[in-house]
Amino acid sequence: MTATAFVAIGGGIGAVLRFHAGRLATAIAGPNAVFPWGTFAINVVGSLLMGVLAGWLARSGGGESLRLMLGVGVLGGFTTFSAFSLETALLVQRGTIGLAALYAAGSVVAGVTGLFLGLSIMRGVA
């Protein structure tokens, strides 16, 4: 199987898991909850699972196919925040604390800014 197939299969699984986790969170917190509990929970769980997977792959040498399907695919489809968390942790582990802080803060600020820019562009188009 190709790398693309591993990622695609895993991504489909992760997206379905995210959909159902979001529905469960809405059912628990209610549709009018002020705090986005579903996304919060998905990001935290996805980051936890990414840590478990990264640690397991490092110990077992689980292989590229598992990394692609589970890490890039399933967890990438479940939440891209897990990859962000892993990359930040790797920068910290390498001793580049300042770069890790810059990456974390910059990613959040740039991401939210990009979202507002996209909304602004679409308001101008509409």
UniProtKB/Swiss-Prot annotation:
Topological relation to the membrane, as annotated: Multi-pass membrane protein
InterPro entries attached to this UniProt entry: FluC
Location in the cell: Cell inner membrane
UniProt note on regulation of activity: Na(+) is not transported, but it plays an essential structural role and its presence is essential for fluoride channel function.
Keywords: Cell inner membrane, Cell membrane, Ion channel, Ion transport, Membrane, Metal-binding, Sodium, Transmembrane, Transmembrane helix, Transport
Keyword Ligase among record annotations: no
The keyword Transmembrane helix appears for this protein: yes
Example of a GO biological process term: cellular detoxification of fluoride
One GO MF term: fluoride channel activity
GO-annotated cellular components: plasma membrane
Catalytic activity: fluoride(in) = fluoride(out)
Binding site for Na(+): G76, T79
Domain of life assignment: Bacteria
Listed Pfam families: CRCB
Positions of transmembrane segments: 1-21, 33-53, 72-92, 97-117
Protein family (similarity comment): Belongs to the fluoride channel Fluc/FEX (TC 1.A.43) family.
HAMAP family per UniProt: FluC
Role noted for this protein: Fluoride-specific ion channel. Important for reducing fluoride concentration in the cell, thus reducing its toxicity.
UniProt name for this protein: Fluoride-specific ion channel FluC
Species in which this protein is naturally found: Novosphingobium aromaticivorans (strain ATCC 700278 / DSM 12444 / CCUG 56034 / CIP 105152 / NBRC 16084 / F199)
